[in-house]
Structure formats: structure tokens, C-alpha cells
Amino acid sequence: MNMLVINGTPRKHGRTRIAASYIAALYHTDLIDLSEFVLPVFNGEAEQSELLKVQELKQRVTKADAIVLLSPEYHSGMSGALKNALDFLSSEQFKYKPVALLAVAGGGKGGINALNNMRTVMRGVYANVIPKQLVLDPVHIDVENATVAENIKESIKELVEELSMFAKAGNPGV
């Protein structure tokens, strides 16, 4: 399966980046890291489609069999960086593509709004968001060692296995 992980945080040293990097490294996948992959602010003008970064984003999403979207929860929603990146994309890249959602929360009750926000946007581009989703709280990220904590690794594995199942069901050649 050709999986793409999109790190939706603009922070270079954030917990979302740690989780995204862990998943990408473990499964040897492509990673778009929005703390480094800088896009202009989406303005809806056609000439933005000609920008090299925008073309690259579209190509990498199109090429993927499945996507993992990760975002911190900012003010009860996904990060502005992720929403901006998604605004450059459409059903042309996402239609029927399986997508897994993962939110990284700052406290014990966050994350669900970011998941719902991502789910709504993905529905708008006709992606197939898988049923399983995850919220990672601070206890799930080992910041000191820049990895995820042992207590969440199995849940991440199950998320990726479900994503893979949906990718294979939609494209038996995967």
C-alpha cells in the first residue's frame, strides 16, 4: 500500500510531528510535514494551481492509495496549516480514497472537535474516512525521545491495519 502521512502542524517540535514521523518511519511511507512543506495562503485564484509546491502536494496525494491525516486541535478544530493545505485539494485527489484521522490533544478532553472538523472536510472531497480514529493525549507522546509512548503503539497499528484493509477493498491490486 502506498500510504501518505500528512503532518498538519506548523510546529517544528510539536507532538503531532512526533506522531506523524513515527507512523511514516514505521510503515516506510511518504510524509508531508507542514512545518517544512510551506504553502502560500489559499486564495482560490487559479494561478495558485501553477505553483510548484501546490502541484507537488496534488501529485503526492493523488499517488497515494491511502492517507493518514494528523492535526493538533487548535480552538476546537484542525490546524490552520492543515486546512490551508486541504483547501488546495479536491475530490480529484481524494474521491473514494481511504483516509485515517488522528488528532493530538493538549489535554484530557481535546481532539474530538479536530477529528470532526477533518471528517467534515474529507466528506466534502468525497474521501472515505475509515471508522477507527485516534486522539493522542500528552501521555501518548514521549517528547524526550521524540517517539510515541508504548501505551499507544498498538492503537496506531490497528488504525493503519484498518486503513490498509479499506485501501485493499477499494483497490484489490494494492
From Swiss-Prot:
Q: What is its EC number?
A: 1.7.-.-
Q: Which cofactor does it need?
A: FMN
What does the entry list under GO cellular component? cytosol
Induction, as annotated: Part of the yhcYZ-yhdA operon that is induced by the two-component regulatory system LiaS/LiaR in response to cell envelope stress.
SUPFAM superfamilies, alphabetized: Flavoproteins
| Residues that, per the record, bind FMN | T9, P10, R11, R15, T16, E73, Y74, H75, S76, G106
Q: Please provide, alphabetically and separated by semicolons, the GO molecular function terms listed in this UniProt record.
A: FMN binding; identical protein binding; oxidoreductase activity
Q: Where is the signal peptide?
A: none
Q: What class of enzyme is it?
A: oxidoreductase
Q: Which domain of life is it from?
A: Bacteria
Q: Please provide the record's keywords in A-Z order.
A: Flavoprotein, FMN, NADP, Oxidoreductase
Family designation: Belongs to the azoreductase type 2 family.
Q: What does this protein do?
A: Catalyzes the reductive cleavage of azo bond in aromatic azo compounds to the corresponding amines. Requires NADPH, but not NADH, as an electron donor for its activity.
Assembly behavior? Homotetramer.
- Write down what this protein is called: FMN-dependent NADPH-azoreductase
Which organism is this entry from?
Answer: Bacillus subtilis (strain 168)
